[in-house]
């Protein structure tokens, strides 16, 4: 149950210390009118509460979190869908700042080889505060392409590419609105529900009417891996249940998002070429709503295996595992790890021609609005399995390595794909418990899991 701190105790206040007691009635609340609402309303034993009613589970948006979290009392069993300062990972400038700091820490403590495992994000500068550092770097490498991104906006809004220092000088003076507006206008025409479907509605959103907001200037990956001549990125889902200790799950399914136009560096102003966001692509004249611009990760993995062989694919996906873990570790000491909180992150990964993955950003509010029937089914399963792992019903033992489509990849240390204790001293033959893009037989796994849990419960009673 949740209530404002100023209110008197009532309802399930006596539940303190009994968070593992099984519950048959879960009161939920959410303001997001999309796939999430369908999943919550169809979950057995879950009932919706509105307005100021007391709740056990709240899938909130980050604006509510910012305004109310510090003033809300929560009993032991209550769960909420964001960590208090999630923006340390999900706001672009903070993410880079934390990754840079973590890399330096690794170099001091473990050497350059270990620190090099953090070299998965393009060279990035925060603007305008690192403007002079950026200019110095820009002049060292004339002619390359850079991309400007507002630190706290989504759906391609405010993004533009450039190669001339004059473009950045115009932006710094607050006169680059023409380029920014062209992208914003196209994305706005997508007519997507702003209450629930936008990615990364950050805790520190900037208002659009200020002349120059904080941006990051990032070296543009000029050699992306292309399929059918088109650029794409990957959306991958990571569920964090705790930061101290770090406990993270990786979902087997996700998707590749394609641009609608063949890739070229000759037209850097054409965002249909360079931005893969669905909100941008669906405004393209060539966009087909039924066809969409997505592949499942399983299809993508099979395609790569046929082109490059299983070994190259294993290396690529292992490198992505490294991105997930290192990025979470980079904020482990700064995220407020409240036991009431969990977070479903949407990672955006770009693959280059050398099959090297690059982290573009991490979303605190990945879109849960479906763009097709296939997308609806994926997100429905994702959300159902998220609720299974969050386990409001207190059915799990806490020792599970797989729940539906989620695989436990980190539990205060790496989790092995093999059963039983593992020797981590050399990590030579260690294989992380991840199956991204592999077969997701979640229904059968859940059936067996809950049957086993029922047997264990009967045996112990």
Curated annotation (Swiss-Prot):
Swiss-Prot/TrEMBL catalytic activity: (L-glutamyl)(n)-gamma-L-glutamyl-L-glutamyl-[protein] + L-glutamate + ATP = (L-glutamyl)(n+1)-gamma-L-glutamyl-L-glutamyl-[protein] + ADP + phosphate + H(+)
Names of required cofactors: Mg(2+)
Site (described: Essential for specifying alpha-elongation versus initiation step of the polyglutamylase activity): 155
One GO MF term: tubulin binding
Binding site for Mg(2+) 1: 348, 361
GO biological process, one term: flagellated sperm motility
Alphabetical UniProt keywords: ATP-binding, Cell projection, Cilium, Cytoplasm, Cytoskeleton, Flagellum, Ligase, Magnesium, Metal-binding, Microtubule, Nucleotide-binding
EC number of this enzyme: 6.3.2.-
A Pfam family of this chain: TTL
Chain segments annotated as coiled-coil in the UniProt record: none
InterPro entries attached to this UniProt entry: ATP_grasp_subdomain_1 (IPR013815), TTL/TTLL_fam (IPR004344)
Entry protein name: Probable tubulin polyglutamylase TTLL9
């Amino acid at each position: 149950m949740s209530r404002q701190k100023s209110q008197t105790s009532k309802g399930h206040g006596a539940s303190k210390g009994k968070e593992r007691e099984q519950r048959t009635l879960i009161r939920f609340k959410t303001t997001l009118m999309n796939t999430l609402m369908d999943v919550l309303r169809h979950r057995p034993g879950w009932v919706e509460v509105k307005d100021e009613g007391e709740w056990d589970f709240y899938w909130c948006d980050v604006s509510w979190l910012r305004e109310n979290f510090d003033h809300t009392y929560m009993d032991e069993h209550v769960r909420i869908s964001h960590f208090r300062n999630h923006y340390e990972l999900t706001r672009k400038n903070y993410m880079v700042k934390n990754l840079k700091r973590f890399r330096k820490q690794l170099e001091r403590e473990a050497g350059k080889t270990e620190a090099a495992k953090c070299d998965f994000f393009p060279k990035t500068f925060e603007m305008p505060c690192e403007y002079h550092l950026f200019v110095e770097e820009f002049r060292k490498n004339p002619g390359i392409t850079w991309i400007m991104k507002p630190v706290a906006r989504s759906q391609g809004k405010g993004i533009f590419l450039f190669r001339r220092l004059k473009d950045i000088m115009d932006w710094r003076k607050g006169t680059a609105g023409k380029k920014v507006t062209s992208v914003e206008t196209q994305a706005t025409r997508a007519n997507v529900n702003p209450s629930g479907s936008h990615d990364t509605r950050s805790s520190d959103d900037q208002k659009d009417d200020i002349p120059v907001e904080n941006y990051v200037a990032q070296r543009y990956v000029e050699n992306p891996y292309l399929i059918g001549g088109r650029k794409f990125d990957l959306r991958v889902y990571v569920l964090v249940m705790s930061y101290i200790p770090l406990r993270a799950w990786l979902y087997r399914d996700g998707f590749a998002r394609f641009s609608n136009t063949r890739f070229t560096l000759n037209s850097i102003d054409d965002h249909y070429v360079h931005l893969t966001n669905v909100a941008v692509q669906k405004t393209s004249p060539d966009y087909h709503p039924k066809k969409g611009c997505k592949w499942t990760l399983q299809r993508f993995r099979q395609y790569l295996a046929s082109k490059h062989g299983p070994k190259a694919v294993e290396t690529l996906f292992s490198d992505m595992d490294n991105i997930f873990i290192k990025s979470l570790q980079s904020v482990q000491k700064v995220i407020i790890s409240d036991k009431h909180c969990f977070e479903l992150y949407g990672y955006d990964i770009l693959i280059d021609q050398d099959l090297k993955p690059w982290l573009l950003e991490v979303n605190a509010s990945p879109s849960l609005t479906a763009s097709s029937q296939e997308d609806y089914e994926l997100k429905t399963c994702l959300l159902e399995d998220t609720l299974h792992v969050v386990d409001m019903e207190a059915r799990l033992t806490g020792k599970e390595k797989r729940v539906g489509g989620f695989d436990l990849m980190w539990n205060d240390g790496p989790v092995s794909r093999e059963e039983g204790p593992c020797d981590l001293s050399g990590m030579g033959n260690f294989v992380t418990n991840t199956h991204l893009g592999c077969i997701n037989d979640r229904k059968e796994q859940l059936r067996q899991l809950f049957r086993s849990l029922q047997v264990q419960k009967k045996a112990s009673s």
